[in-house]
């Protein structure tokens, strides 16, 4: 037990400087700043989404980003039968995690997506009725796509080199 607690303390000591660097990066990089303006996206989700999407202009539409994240539904079809499958789960699991974390905040009353989330949750037909969080995840990724695409080159620019103080 003491060994495990010591290891946790060692890892915490290693994590704290990295946490500070990521927070500084998120505060100074324009793409991350823009992503953090969306409800539910904090500094960690912003950095992950920014890093995983990269240049949003490489996607011709927001749907391609949703497919890239693996949040699209596969379809099985044979002859005249066509049945919806499951999530493709192709792409980055980190991007899916960040989108999920941001989407879970949509159930809160202060969220701009609260009405959308609860409307889907009340609906019992179709896939969205089963998982309104998935629909909100897609919606958030589409917003992120448009935000980064509008920024253009500024979304990818290196952050301001002046470091800011971060409260631990």
Residue ranges and their predicted role:
Residues 1-168:
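A detector of single, family-specific signature residues
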């Amino acid at each position: 037990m003491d060994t495990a607690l010591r290891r946790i303390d060692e890892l915490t000591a290693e994590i704290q400087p990295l946490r500070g660097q990521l927070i500084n990066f998120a505060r100074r990089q324009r793409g991350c700043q823009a992503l953090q303006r969306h409800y539910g996206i904090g500094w960690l989700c912003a950095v992950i989404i920014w890093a995983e999407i990269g240049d949003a202009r490489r996607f011709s539409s927001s749907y391609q980003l949703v497919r890239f994240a693996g949040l699209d539904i596969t379809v099985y079809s044979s002859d005249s039968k066509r049945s919806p499958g499951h999530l493709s789960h192709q792409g980055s699991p980190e991007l899916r995690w960040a989108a999920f974390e941001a989407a879970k905040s949509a159930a809160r009353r202060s969220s701009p997506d609260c009405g959308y989330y609860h409307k889907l949750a009340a609906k019992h037909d179709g896939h969205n009725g089963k998982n309104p969080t998935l629909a909100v995840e897609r919606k958030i990724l589409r917003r992120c796509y448009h935000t980064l695409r509008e920024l253009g080159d500024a979304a990818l620019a290196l952050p301001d080199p002046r470091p800011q103080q971060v409260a631990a």
